[in-house]
Curated annotation (Swiss-Prot):
Residues 1-42 are annotated as: Disordered. The keyword Isomerase does not apply. The gene is ODA9. This is Dynein, 78 kDa intermediate chain, flagellar outer arm. It comes from Chlamydomonas reinhardtii (Chlamydomonas smithii). Is essential for arm assembly or attachment to the outer doublet microtubule. WD repeats lie at residues 358-398, 407-450, 562-602, 608-647.
Length: 683
């Protein structure tokens, strides 16, 4: 070991700083060795000298004993933090928030295998088989050596002589005579050939059937009394029919259009397969964890190029096909009137309407006939009423009210088909702003109107006996609805511009049965409950923000629901008698269930943006609802399980009686709460 430099005296005195307690303790513990004897310098003990830099930091005892926490993180400091990738959905570059933080310092492929792995088991089995084979081979060698020792010395066989296989070896060769090859040919004339081709298609089969039917018709004409003249007439009619079909262009033939429609529907079904599965099988699983709340699932959106920038004024389901509905387009604004449009859509083809009809004025209401599903009654803004036959696929109506046949002067707001038990003819009822409730009868050539009721203003405090039709002024009609209870089909409700709702009958055209005054402004929607004979909804849409449930016995509102926005429409659910919904101008759909919550909606969901909802209608067989807006779009929504809870009647109990009892209970509770509030106000 090299000798250390000699100690320096006064080294610590000139340095800045202060010695710590530990350093002083070490300095006190150190005892320098004794000086060496003369002549023993080579064997002297080394002297330890503590060499310190001039800029060394002096720390106190507390600083030295302080614990410094070290934190290990899993973040890679070398990982990039500004990676961006192109988002194909939004068509923009977006920052990638998640970056791989793994750092590989060393990696090698190991050769060790776990004993329980499949590959290790296979290797151990192979080694075991090799060991067993080696053991058997060694045992055979040992056994042979023992046998050789037992038998003594045996001379080995002489392998010098070559052995021949007597089965494969022939010592002598023999050659035989090979006969030469001979060819024998014959030449004949080939039989004549002909190319025959043909095609069998549906239209060729159809043409053959038509020809066969024509031959049968000619044969029957020959056998009849007319003889040759009748046969000639039948032959001429068949020739004219063929000539007419031949002049139809191929691209305009009905068969081609039908085939293209089928192909278009198949393509749409493949495109919207997921939506169709949601329509059939979707149920919101979260409803099980949030009782008293529900949701609406958007399904299809129905809009066409011609319906854009038009307001949806009416929606009606077809009574025969539960997947088909008609939509009427018009305008509620007086200064923005234009031509009308009617689109008939199907849930199987949401891309295009099945049928389209145009009207000169805006369409305000549509209604399918409940028995003859091909007849569609239409009311327009200019006061005209039309009847279309959807099967004809023609843009012209089969019936239209003209000025000569009693065309109305004001907009027709509501229209309903009505049965005629006496004459067995087709009839429908309309209501317009001029206060006329007309009954229209379809004859062979025209529409015949009949005035059922002339609405008039009822003064406050006036009784039914004091009513004077000549003294009171005319009231403007806005909406109507017929009672759906058996035996009461002739009773209907009428909403007026004065805020009154009149209960009328087709049998009494001079007086109101009763009058309800629950709104301060015009009533634009009124709907009777499907099973309760005295419960109905009314709404003063777009004006006083209230949807009101009424019971006709006390002639006053039983329950009021303030939705804090202008209401577009209100309607009862077809499958749940205690459920109703309303749409507002802010694009929300409010769904109420009086059996679960009598004050607040179970669902208040925004379904459209930058649009006002104008119409609402429930499907009569499926738990879906259609809502229309002022942009010409119709959206279909599916109700979650909490929004379509129905009562399960016990054995011997009817579903209708149970639901009526529930509604009566709701009315009774509302009456008691009103009575308690009146008592508290009196005190």
């Amino acid at each position: 070991m090299p000798a250390l430099s000699p100690a320096k005296k006064g080294t610590d005195k000139g340095k800045t700083g202060k010695k710590t307690g530990k350093q002083e303790q070490n300095a006190q513990d150190y005892i320098p060795p004794p000086p060496p004897m003369p002549g023993d310098e080579a064997f002297a003990m080394p002297i330890r000298e503590i060499v310190k830099p001039d800029n060394q930091l002096w720390l106190s005892e507390a600083d030295l004993n302080e614990e410094v926490a070290k934190m290990l993180t899993a973040n890679n400091p070398a990982a990039p933090k500004n990676i961006v990738r192109f988002n194909m959905k939004d068509k923009v570059f977006k920052l990638e928030p998640m970056v791989e933080q793994t750092v590989v310092h060393y990696a090698t492929d190991g050769w060790l295998l776990h004993k329980s792995s499949d590959e290790a088991k296979r290797q151990m089995d192979m080694e075991k088989m090799e060991q067993e084979a080696s053991a058997r081979f060694q045992a055979d060698i040992d056994r042979a050596s023992h046998e050789h020792k037992d038998h003594g010395d045996v001379e080995p066989p002489d392998d010098s002589r070559q052995l021949r296989n007597q089965f494969n070896f022939s010592e002598r060769a023999a050659q035989t005579l090979n006969y030469p090859l001979r060819d024998r040919e014959t030449f004949t004339e080939p039989p004549p050939t002909a190319t025959v081709s043909g095609a069998c298609t549906q239209w060729e089969i159809y043409d053959e059937y038509i020809k066969d039917l024509e031959r049968q018709r000619i044969d029957e004409a020959m056998k009849s009394k007319g003889g040759k003249k009748a046969a000639a007439a039948a032959r001429a009619a068949g020739a004219a029919h063929r000539q007419r079909n031949e002049h139809v262009p191929t691209l305009q033939s009905p068969t081609l259009m039908h085939s293209l429609g089928t192909l278009d529907r198949m393509v749409n079904q493949n495109m919207y397969e997921e939506v169709a599965m949601d329509f059939k099988y979707w149920d919101d699983a979260s409803d099980a964890f949030r009782p008293g709340e529900g949701s609406l699932l958007p399904l299809w959106r129905f809009v066409s190029d011609k319906s854009k920038r038009r307001q949806v004024t009416s929606v009606c389901w077809n009574p025969l096909y539960d997947d088909m509905f008609a939509v009427g387009y018009g305008s509620y604004e007086f200064l923005k009137q234009a031509s009308g449009l009617i689109n008939i859509y199907s849930l199987k083809n949401p891309s295009h309407p099945e049928y389209t009809f145009h009207t000169e004025s805006g369409v305000m209401c549509v209604h399918f006939h409940p028995e003859f599903a091909n007849l569609l009654a239409v009311g327009c803004y200019d006061g005209s009423v039309l009847v279309y036959d959807v099967r004809l696929k023609k843009d012209e109506p089969i019936y239209q009210a003209s000025v000569r046949t009693g065309k109305l002067n004001d907009p027709v707001w509501q229209i309903y088909w009505q049965p005629d038990d006496a004459q067995k003819s087709l009839q429908f009822v309309s209501i317009s702003s001029d206060g006329a409730v007309n009954l229209w009868t379809l004859t062979k050539s025209e529409l015949i109107p009949e005035c059922l009721m002339k609405l008039r203003v009822v003064r406050a405090g006036e009784t039914r006996e004091e009513e004077d039709p000549n003294a009171s002024g005319a009231a403007g009609g806005c909406c109507m609805d017929f009672c759906k209870m058996p035996g009461q089909e002739s009773i209907y409700l009428v909403g007026t511009e004065e805020g009154a709702i009149h209960r009328c009958s087709k049998a009494y055209s001079s007086q109101y049965l009763s009058t309800y005054v629950s709104h301060h402004l015009a009533v634009y929607a009124v709907h009777w409950n499907n099973i309760h004979p005295s419960m109905f909804l009314s709404a003063s849409c777009r004006l006083d923000h209230q949807a009101v449930g009424l019971c006709h016995d006390p002639k006053r509102a039983v329950m009021n629901f303030d939705l804090n926005d202008s209401i577009g429409d209100v309607s009862w659910a077809a499958l749940q008698p205690t459920v109703f919904a309303a749409v507002t101008d802010d694009g929300r759909v409010h769904v109420f269930d009086l059996a679960q919550n009598k004050l607040l909606p179970l669902c208040s969901q925004k379904v459209v943006k930058k649009a006002k909802l104008t119409k609402l209608v429930f499907n009569p067989k499926h738990p879906i609802v259609l809502v229309g807006d002022d942009k010409g779009c119709v959206t279909s929504l599916k109700l979650s399980p909490n929004l379509r809870i129905t009562s399960k009647p016990e054995k011997g109990q009817k579903f209708e009686d149970l639901e009526v009892a529930k509604l009566d209970g709701v009315v009774e509770i509302a009456r008691k709460s009103d009575a308690d509030l009146a008592k508290n106000a009196a005190h």
